[in-house]
Amino acid sequence: MTTMVKTGKWIAKHRILIVLIGILLLIPSVIGTIKTRINYDILSYLPESLETVKGQDVMVDEFGTGAFSMVVVEDMPLKDVQKLKNKFEEIEHVKKVLWYDDIADISVPTSMMPKDLKNIFFADDSTMMLVLFDNTTSSDEAMEAVTNMRAIVDKQCFISGMSGVVTDIKNLCLQELPIYVAIAALFSFIVLEITGTSFVVPILFLLCIGISILYNMGTNIFLGEISYLTQALVAILQLGVTMDYSIFLLDSFEENKKRFPGDKNRAMGHAISNTFKSIVSSSITTVAGFAALCLMTFALGKNLGIVMAKGVIIGVICCVTLLPAIILIFDPLIEKTKHKPLIKNTNRLSGFIIRHYKIWLAVFCIGLLPAVYGNNHTKIYYNIDKSLPSTLDSNVANKKLEDTFDMSTMHIIMMDKNISNANRTTLMKDIEKVDGVKWAFGLNSVFGANVPASMIPKDVKDMLQSDEQELVFVCSKYSSATDESNSQIAAINDLVKKYDSNGMVIGEAPLMKDLQDVTDIDLVNVNVASVAAIFIIIMLVFKSISVPIILVAVIEFAINVNMAIPFFQGIELPFVASIVVGTIQLGATVDYAILMTSRYQKERRKGFGKKEAVMNAHKACALSIMTSGFSFFAATFGVAWYSKVDMI
């Protein structure tokens, strides 16, 4: 008797103890889940070595601010706008609000204002103020400030900027997350009921997987924080990826009950041993695929990869400990609620596929070229607010800013304050000549190069100048993450470096430009690493070169087909999809490939010919694979159908 069989029998004998321990472990898991901070700013995962990221940190240190929002106020008397500004400044974590009254008295008619100044703060019947926060864009403090600002404004006011977008993402995810989980569970339940043989089994499967998901989410406390994408996706992905382990265990238990009639503990002991042997290699390949995400310089990959890999490991442990205990406890109920399966077997399907294998090979060869072409030409977008509903407050405000003031984004230039007045003036003029720049706002542009420092309002000077650095705000007509915006940022950066080699262009659009540059490289690295890792593991498991070549080729073909479909539909994908979908699909489906191949080799060892062995393997595995695959599809499809966040 093997050690694993003995362990399995021990688990079966002490099933009540196992379940009690499982329930008790839920307490720290729930606490850990609640205590784990959720990060709603994707841009915060960019490498800290990037100049744009360093610039944000320097800005916080030098100026006490790292995030800002543009507020558009429509059809409101200037006195009321001034009162609103004062209310904003009283809100905790609002560092400073810059408006026209910081530079001139509001009693001066707008018609008498200098044209440059008027263009910055006024357009038609609207005015704009710049609200600076005392922390970074994704900080809880900045989001709290935006929420409090929204609470005191009416329909005449529109709060735009990245802090508003991040706040809306948080609110939307908090609202939708419980529904994601409910939909995924419901759709998986329906599939399991259709393909299963007992009304109770799907409930037990979902219960055990739900517990393992809670364990996974609870242990995230050791990471400090996880991204909102990780939080939203991991539960559904863990449900789909680990479902097949549960199915394998139950199938093995049913087989061993026939081998050992009247001895359920012995049957379960052997089922645990068989299941562990079957899933250990496939789970290692899945973990390796997800772990490849950790190689990304964009730290979201590491965050997602660690949590997903950890989820698979926890899922395997629960599958060979907690699930057997639950199944044994409820086995009498399982027997009472058994029914005839709607799909008894796949014999006819298997026969059709094997008889016409040449047709499927032809389909593979014919479809390969358009699949690869479509995958390589699928359009990707990097603009985060584009993935959100247009009705959200932040998107409405951004659209209002664009329509009213003809501006989409604001760049910040941080440069040495000791640059000569002549060079500073030349730099400002050159920046305003860059394509798509509407205006540049700095001390020189507002007060002139010859105005003594003593005559500049202290609040404005403190906001734009520190002991060593000076800020210039640059208004751009171009949306973030577009070719025009990226070219504009590059041109401005070249101008700044001409006068200050340590000068920086920072803000939302520069960060998104870096995001595009970083993830383009990461995409290649992750794909190569995940394929290489899985290839090597399969090669070691099967002691063959041809097997990993065949399995990886088939899965990569499926990934290319999947990623090519949006191209032929004319749909743009969010950048996250291009990075993680392939890795997730590779990690999730390699289990099926290993299961089918292992069964084929087993049939060959029994003496069957190649065709008969493939036929037998297909008949034995197809239903389990289809059940798990359709369950995964149903869960992810349900979430995609409901979610208002395109990235999810």
Briefly describe each language-model feature range:
Residues E48-A67, V73-V166, K379-V547, A553-E572:
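Structured non-transmembrane domains adjacent to transmembrane bundles in polytopic membrane proteins
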Residues M1-I38, T137-Y382, K497-I648:
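Membrane-embedded transmembrane helical bundles of large multi-pass transporters/channels
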